Amino acid sequence: MIQQVKPSLDPPANGGANASIDASPLLSVRNIEVVYDEVILVLRGLSLDVPRGAVVALLGANGAGKSTTLKAISGLLKTENGEVTRGEIVFDGERIDGGDPVRTVRRGISQVMEGRRIIADLTALENLRLGAFTRRDKEVARDIEMVFAYFPRLKER
């Protein structure tokens, strides 16, 4: 079960960490239903709003629907024969459910898989090369260029 956790204290009236959060949602998931293999209902009636500037975490037990929710938002359900069959997902005023995952990533939405740790003492480039040790150098160089094109700040790390 996924539930939205609301803070127990109101943000400070004089500004503070939450002062820059805009009240209008940047991401809105509205009453979605997700089905796998056309018959397995995984999520039903899930709704949540993510305000601009907010940091949100989905917490729950194994099988609660966290990964499925993130796959629905990032457009990756099709890779596992899943689909949003009801409701809608809106990002910055535009519907994105059922859309192209590449376009979704270009909007700045992506899923970070759990349990994938980088080696902190290595640069981003060294971590990328480490994960590609079985591939040819030309392929790796091309793919690393593409990663840096999508995420230019990684070059700095």
Predicted regions and their residues:
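Helix-to-loop junction immediately C-terminal to a conserved catalytic motif
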Residues: 74
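Short coil-to-beta microelement around the adenine-binding A-loop and adjacent beta1/P-loop entry
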Residues: 39-41, 103
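Short beta-strand immediately N-terminal to the Walker A/P-loop
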Residues: 56-57, 111
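Conserved ABC transporter NBD signature motif
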Residues: 84-94, 107, 140-146
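The feature captures the beta-strand-to-loop junction immediately N-terminal to the Walker
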Residues: 59-64
